[in-house]
Amino acid sequence: MDTREVRKIDISRWKDQYIDFLYTSNDGLRLYFQRYKRTWDETEICMVNTETGDVKVLIHEEDKPYLDYQMRAIHFLNDGNEILFRSERTGWGHYYLYDKDGNLKNQVTSGPWVAGPIQKIDTAKRQIYFVGLGKEKNIDPYYYVLYRADLDKKDAVTLLTPENASHDVAIAPSSRYFVDSYSRVDLEPVN
């Protein structure tokens, strides 16, 4: 693949679009990018075949009035053979697992609550650890709590920090344990 050849690739779709380059496969044959419409209400995750220059749209997303850029999450698993993508297509932020061709494999989380930022992905166990908001009836919906979900099962979500407080968690590289510091306005930090 190391030909040092410069190849111009047409990645234009919308006038004044915004481009984020996301990932390159280990073999260098696939390049992934995300493009946004200037109005920020439409986006596409695309893959470029670096040998041919062909661009393929894998995921197309629209959200009115606009996409929430700050909560955006795209993770490439197993060298780009799977894509974990966060979407608000149902009105709630949730995670979706796609194959390398953009076919939906599983909606990992769902329901009337928000799946927030990912804290860790364990590809060996096929699990994600993420912040959730508003899922538990007895926990203030503004508090960050930690959940674990299985990538291959729909709604296999487990609450890991059940205290009614906002949690700040550090997860061990092995995913076997985590350190939790939680607090709220009327509760000093507990570790």
What are the residue ranges of the model-derived segments?
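Peripheral, non-catalytic segments that deliver or gate enzyme domains
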Residues: 1-191
